[in-house]
Amino acid sequence: YRLTYYTPDYQVAETDILAAFRMTPQPGVPAEECGAAVAAESSTGTWTTVWTDGLTQLDKYKGRCYDLEPVPGENNQYIAYVAYPIDLFEEGSVTNLLTSIVGNVFGFKALRALRLEDLRIPPAYVKTFWGPPHGIQVERDKLNKYGRPLLGCTIKPKLGLSAKNYGRAVYECLRGGLDFTKDDENVNSQSFMRWRDRFLFCAEAIYKAQSETGEIKGHYLNATAGTCEEMYKRANYAAQIGVPIVMHDYLTGGFTANTSLAMFCRDNGLLLHIHRAMHAVIDRQRNHGIHFRVLAKTLRMSGGDHLHSGTVVGKLEGEREVTLGFVDLMRDPYVEKDRSRGIYFTQDWVGLGGTIPVASGGIHVWHMPALTEIFGDDACLQFGGGTLGHPWGNAPGAAANRVASEACVQARNEGRDLSREGGDVIREACKWSPEL
């Protein structure tokens, strides 16, 4: 492999798709051989020379390992940079992109472990994707909500409630001051609560809360299903009853289904909330798998208006700088290379819409100052137990979150330092909000 696929003199083309792999070779296997093997196995190579190689232009189509750097502080671990010609990939297909780059190479014998740390998607390839159904600005315009983070809540217990009781919990949270409530990722259509009943009772809750508060409300109706046809049926029903947003579990549902649903949502005026169930199976190991920043990039291409992104402060794992790095990759039009935040390549999204990061998991009102400072306005903060665990009930829990959020936004706008004064801001707000 090394003679053909390790090319340290290669000049990267503007249209190349670039990958950074964290590579741990087996003892005794040279890093150059491993890097070349990764490039070969994820592009045109196979385990032996085949006569049909002579019938194609291998130099035009092969992946190339063009750089290797040792990982500081790690024994026998390297970052291998691989460049792939754009012609290897089908236009507008995240499925094909991932099948090519990570489909086969991770079981390779010469490697002890392999992790895809980052991808550079060139503008020429980005332009073949539709991206999020609507994007951040259109969502704000649809909801008529500006200048603050959006607030949500996952209805708990996530399994076991009847549709009517579920709808009642939705209504109380929305009436109390939240913008959204949410189906949990494993709420689909079980015997205790079929999807159509849930959709109807949640729609009733949304309309009742809207008429009482004068604000636009939503509930993420989970359209994830066992087949794409059933998923379309559920999303179509949501559009017919006039709700603003549906939801999809994009890793368990698959990228093909997700891209199809994103196109449906764009055509039918629905926002699309994306849950990342199963991500930790893929991204939690430090030296093997796929980093979440890659899953976030591919989701932005496939299509989603919201994506769960970790909290930095709650019960689920997430390092601050690294989390902020992939939050920027989800939202911003252009992101500079910054290794301190785990960003290996400069990424230009050339007009592809942004995805709102969703902070969810073990957060409550005392986290509000930190969340406001870390995520800024273009984020959705979701308090499940932090709303429903309020001693007075769901609506007071929702009111407490809304008051805390608005107090933090006001303090920030007045120039106060939330990292130092956050606790004081919340305590001051308590004086005029008994719920808080």
Swiss-Prot record:
Pfam families: RuBisCO_large, RuBisCO_large_N. InterPro entries: RuBisCO (IPR033966), RuBisCo_large_chain_AS (IPR020878), RuBisCO_lsu_C (IPR000685), RuBisCO_lsu_C_sf (IPR036376), RuBisCO_lsu_fd_N (IPR017443), RuBisCO_lsu_N_sf (IPR036422), RuBisCO_lsuI (IPR020888). The modification N6-carboxylysine is found at residue 182. Its EC number is 4.1.1.39. Binds 1 Mg(2+) ion per subunit. GO terms for biological process: photorespiration; reductive pentose-phosphate cycle. Mg(2+) binds at residues 182, 184-185. GO terms for cellular component: chloroplast. The record marks 315 as: Transition state stabilizer. It is an enzyme of class 4 (lyase). Its cofactor is Mg(2+). Signal peptide: none annotated. Substrate binds at residues 104, 154, 158, 276, 308, 360. The active site is at 156 (proton acceptor), 275 (proton acceptor). One of its GO terms (molecular function) is magnesium ion binding. Keywords: Calvin cycle, Carbon dioxide fixation, Chloroplast, Disulfide bond, Lyase, Magnesium, Metal-binding, Monooxygenase, Oxidoreductase, Photorespiration, Photosynthesis, Plastid. It comes from the Eukaryota. It is found in: Plastid, Chloroplast. Its main location: plastid. Heterohexadecamer of 8 large chains and 8 small chains; disulfide-linked. The disulfide link is formed within the large subunit homodimers. Belongs to the RuBisCO large chain family. Type I subfamily. The basic functional RuBisCO is composed of a large chain homodimer in a 'head-to-tail' conformation. In form I RuBisCO this homodimer is arranged in a barrel-like tetramer with the small subunits forming a tetrameric 'cap' on each end of the 'barrel'. RuBisCO catalyzes two reactions: the carboxylation of D-ribulose 1,5-bisphosphate, the primary event in carbon dioxide fixation, as well as the oxidative fragmentation of the pentose substrate in the photorespiration process. Both reactions occur simultaneously and in competition at the same active site. This is Ribulose bisphosphate carboxylase large chain. It comes from Euglena anabaena. The gene is rbcL.
